[in-house]
């Protein structure tokens, strides 16, 4: 039993060491064989746009509402993941698991109602 565990640790250690060696080797080769940039040329830093000189600022300033919507999406997507996992073991969970799922969904739905009430999901500004 101990020999099997020891062999597994050695295999894992060899894997980690070889991964580190491979990373160091790739980084070293790219440093040695890569292009040296001695003179800063402005035209090399511009993105290629089919031969047309770029116009305007390439940085987009997005509203914070986009980030909020993305965070809400991730939260409710995780809710769907948990409900899917719960639905696959619903027979083993029994009534207690059913009540726990109802509590879970009700907490999340109350959070959604709260977000709607404070206006976090509104896209238009408030005109008072």
UniProtKB/Swiss-Prot annotation:
Pfam annotation, one family: Oxidored_q4
Cellular component GO terms held in the UniProt record: NADH dehydrogenase complex; plasma membrane
Gene Ontology MF terms in the entry: NADH dehydrogenase (ubiquinone) activity; NADH:ubiquinone reductase (non-electrogenic) activity; quinone binding
EC number: 7.1.1.-
Compartments it resides in: Cell membrane
Annotated keywords: Cell membrane, Membrane, NAD, Quinone, Translocase, Transmembrane, Transmembrane helix, Transport, Ubiquinone
HAMAP family (alphabetical): NDH1_NuoA
Record PANTHER family: NADH-QUINONE OXIDOREDUCTASE SUBUNIT A, NADH-UBIQUINONE OXIDOREDUCTASE CHAIN 3
Protein name: NADH-quinone oxidoreductase subunit A
Origin superkingdom: Bacteria
Primary subcellular site in the record, as a coarse category: membrane
Chain's gene name: nuoA
Keyword NAD: yes
Membrane topology: Multi-pass membrane protein
Top EC class of this enzyme: translocase
Assembly and binders: NDH-1 is composed of 14 different subunits. Subunits NuoA, H, J, K, L, M, N constitute the membrane sector of the complex.
Catalytic activity field: a quinone + NADH + 5 H(+)(in) = a quinol + NAD(+) + 4 H(+)(out)
The keyword Transmembrane is assigned to this record: yes
Family as reported in the entry's similarity comment: Belongs to the complex I subunit 3 family.
């Amino acid at each position: 039993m101990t020999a099997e565990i020891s062999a597994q640790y050695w295999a894992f250690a060899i894997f980690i060491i070889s991964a580190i060696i491979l990373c160091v080797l790739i980084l070293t080769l790219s440093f040695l064989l890569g292009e040296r940039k001695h003179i800063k040329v402005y035209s090399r830093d511009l993105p290629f746009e089919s031969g047309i000189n770029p116009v305007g600022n390439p940085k987009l300033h997005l509203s914070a509402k986009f980030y909020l919507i993305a965070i809400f999406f991730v939260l409710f997507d995780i809710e769907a993941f948990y409900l899917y996992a719960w639905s696959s073991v619903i027979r083993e969970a029994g009534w207690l698991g059913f009540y726990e799922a109802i509590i879970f969904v009700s907490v999340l739905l109350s959070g959604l109602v709260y977000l709607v009430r404070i206006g976090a999901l509104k896209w238009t500004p408030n005109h008072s």
